[in-house]
Amino acid sequence: IDWYRNFSNGVKEISKIYQIPLIGGDFTKGQLNINIIVYGEPFLDKILKRSGANDGDFICISKQVGRAKKGLKDLQLGKTNSSFIDDYLRPESKIDLGKEISEIATSCIDTSDGLLADLKHILNSSNVGAEIYLDEIPFTQNIDDINAGDDYDLCFTIPENYLKDSFYIIGKVTKNKSIKLISEKGYDVEINGYKHF
């Protein structure tokens, strides 16, 4: 009962924050199985797609990578006062950022499967490559955080004239269809990330 009450309150809170009405539900006896479906109608000229990145666009993110990974680790170690735990248990939706960049970003993806793995989806969909400046990536613990999932940040590409101080510039889109990792600090990483199948 307590778990159900907490879950219901969480759904109610989120639906209120994002103004998404809860319009139905179905209860049956059996193993716990929760599915949530959200329907909406997009503004066609403001849809953020994976495709659309152009040669010369800058690759950006808006926060440190690896925060959720650190939160999970702290949770497993019993560090209940860690500020990173909420990044793992209660990730914030990037709706406001999405709205902010919807008219300037040429492509976009969330980083739930790991920054480099998800960036690869943009590059493949856009038929381009990238130079990634490893020294510029704001990581939480170490450079391997760029392969950590569950961060739910947005990785996006934008032309130079739309850059903002609040964006971390981590690379540049290139015509060459490969990914070149650049580091003067000697960082050496492989592109991994979560694989669904």
Region spans (language model):
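Short, conserved charged micro-motifs
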Residues: 2, 47, 160-166
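Active-site-proximal betaalpha loop/short-helix elements
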Residues: 88-151
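Short hydrophobic/aromatic beta-strand micro-patches
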Residues: 39-41, 155-159
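Glycine-rich anion-binding loops of enzyme active sites
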Residues: 1-73, 172
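Short, ordered loop/turn segments at secondary-structure junctions
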Residues: 27-28, 64, 113-114, 135-137, ...
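Short, compositionally biased
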Residues: 69-87
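Acidic, Ser/Thr/Pro-rich beta/coil linker or hinge segments at domain junctions
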Residues: 89-92, 164-197
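Active-site glycine-rich loop that binds ribose-phosphate moieties when present
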Residues: 36-49, 82-100
